[in-house]
Design a protein with these regions (language model features):
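C-terminal helix-rich "cap/oligomerization" subdomain common to oxidoreductases
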Residues: 87, 159-200
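Solvent-exposed beta-strand sheet faces enriched in polar/charged residues
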Residues: 48-50, 95, 199
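Predominantly a Rossmann-like dinucleotide-binding segment in NAD(P)-dependent oxidoreductases
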Residues: 1-73, 193
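Active-site rim elements
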Residues: 20-23, 69-71, 143-147, 165-173
Length: 200
């Protein structure tokens, strides 16, 4: 998920003791959660990551979402990327930024999945495949199911139902643990300057 100079430069976002991190924690958590869901929640085993602050240190740095200068005491990253290896052999590359020189106004959130039988893009719902016998390339757009509620609101309803009915959480804790372990791995890898193991 990438943004171009689009963030809220207040303490709750830019001070690590209050936020826990920058865009990795703020917006990366959402794209990572969705990606792992699309992948079937494989177990992460190692992470190589970078989490740095460069662009928001420049003189005159600003956010299109908030007036004024970026606070001088900002101590979280403005860009992070990670390479994740999973127990099943899958890999993942993630990039998140609040301030990247990227051709978007607002937010660019995309997921590309690549497998042996095809590739897919979210949110475009494109599916790409190849017939190796006939040497044909196929590009299809999948039908997107419409929702009665906005997806985030639907998540809240499902969680409330689970609590009211003493049922299991619709999102098992293990899935959230994988997300947090990967984000933590990106920060640990940045600090240690190497690939780190994810112990779960």
């Amino acid at each position: 998920m990438l943004r171009r100079n689009a963030f809220i430069p207040t303490a709750g976002f830019v001070k690590k003791e209050l936020s826990g991190g920058g865009p990795c924690i703020d917006i990366g958590v959402h794209v990572l959660d969705l990606t792992l869901w699309l992948m079937g929640h494989p177990k992460p085993v190692s992470v190589t990551g970078v989490a740095r602050r460069e662009l928001t240190k420049k003189p005159g740095a600003f956010s299109v979402w908030h007036p004024g200068a970026v606070p001088a005491d900002m101590d979280v990253e403005d860009f992070a990327s990670g390479f994740v290896r999973f127990e099943n052999g899958a890999t993942l590359v993630i990039e998140v930024s609040w301030a990247l020189h990227h051709d978007t106004m607002g937010e660019d959130m995309q997921i590309w999945l690549y497998g042996q039988d095809g590739g897919a893009n979210w949110p475009k719902a494109e599916f790409l495949s190849t017939n190796y016998e006939t040497r044909q390339l196929y590009n299809r757009t999948l039908k997107v199911t419409s929702y009665q509620l906005e997806p985030h609101a639907q998540e809240c309803v499902e969680f409330a139902r689970a609590v009211a009915n003493d049922a299991p959480s619709p999102v098992p804790a293990e899935q959230s643990l994988y997300v947090i372990a990967i984000l933590d791995g990106i920060y640990r890898s940045q600090r240690e300057g190497r690939e780190v193991t994810v112990d779960l």
